[in-house]
Amino acid sequence: NLMNHYVGMQYIPDTIPEFKIFPVAIGIMVVLGVIIGFLGNHKLFLAWFVLMCILGTAGMYDFYLWEYDYGHNLSPKAIMNFKNPDGSVMGFQPPLFGSKVILNFTAHSYPRTGAYFLFVGMMLTLAAFFVGRKEKKA
């Protein structure tokens, strides 16, 4: 927020709804995953995996929409106005994943430890589904 107003970005509040929704959703999915683990039904493992994929995709899409909105809906009254070669207002959207040069800055966006743990947990759940399916056939 300190520098964003110079290029016309909106103020980013600390109380966006996602900061309340995401922790609850993650907590529910953890509890649901533990319950499914104790039940040991391989079909439920797959259902949990698919639900996590859907929720993860929805979360990334929501984050992309926030980035797009804040990076493209700029105030025309900003102290600094930057234009693209075609005369349109230059956007300042950071990357969802990867690196991107924005003027003389390079913005980076890569997963951290929590994302790696989430990925490992999802892969273990998928592996448990295949093991459970194989055991049921035998």
Q: Where on the chain are the PLM-derived regions?
A:
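Long, glycine/tryptophan/cysteine-rich extracytoplasmic
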Residues: 1-18, 64-109
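Hydrophobic alpha-helical transmembrane segments
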Residues: 17-37, 46-57, 116-122
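Mature, soluble, non-transmembrane domains
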Residues: 37-76, 98-100
